[in-house]
Amino acid sequence: MAEQTEKAFQKQVGVTGCFKSKEKKAPGKSGHRFFKNVGLNFKTPKEAIDGNYVDKKCPFTGNVSIRGRILTGVVKSSKMMRTIIVRRDYLHFIPKYARYEKRHTNIPAHVSPCFRVRDGDTVIIGQCRPLSKTIRFNVLRVIPQAGATGKKSFSGF
């Protein structure tokens, strides 16, 4: 999975390595891994509870709270490390012609290692504090792509 790949040793904040008990505990409900419920009826993934990755920007195991907008979109690009581009389609009204035109916007979002995201998947993202210069959203749920629809196709409302 996402083991130690950085130069500095990665560890979860708030979880120390020196424990009084000598028996080994596996990560999970009784183990020494920090995870939380983000609320808003989003379940914590099993990989976040039982996994061994360390991500301080993960909403389930890191120091990030979800507040503000909850949006849905289609994954356009997943080439960046732990970051995806989400395409949101919408209709814009033109008063002169009394008609709507199709428009879209691209939103960069942080994706936790507990999710397996591919291009074309539908994701639910939640707003959080600024994680970098452009990233202000975090992936909360992934809905796998059902059919062979393209990633640039306009989805209905």
Curated annotation (Swiss-Prot):
CDD domains: Ribosomal_uS17
Superkingdom in the source lineage: Eukaryota
Short name of any one Pfam family annotated for the protein: Ribosomal_S17_N
Sorted UniProt keywords: Ribonucleoprotein, Ribosomal protein, RNA-binding, rRNA-binding
Annotated coiled-coil segments of the chain: none
GO molecular-function term, one example from the UniProt record: structural constituent of ribosome
InterPro entries linked: NA-bd_OB-fold (IPR012340), Ribosomal_uS17 (IPR000266), Ribosomal_uS17_arc/euk (IPR028333), Ribosomal_uS17_CS (IPR019979), Ribosomal_uS17_N (IPR032440)
GO CC, any one term: cytosolic small ribosomal subunit
UniProt record, GO biological process: translation
PANTHER family, alphabetized: 40S RIBOSOMAL PROTEIN S11 FAMILY MEMBER, 40S RIBOSOMAL PROTEIN S11-RELATED
NCBIfam families: PRK08572.1 (NF006345), uS17_arch (TIGR03630)
Family note: Belongs to the universal ribosomal protein uS17 family.
Protein name (record): Small ribosomal subunit protein uS17
Gene: RPS11
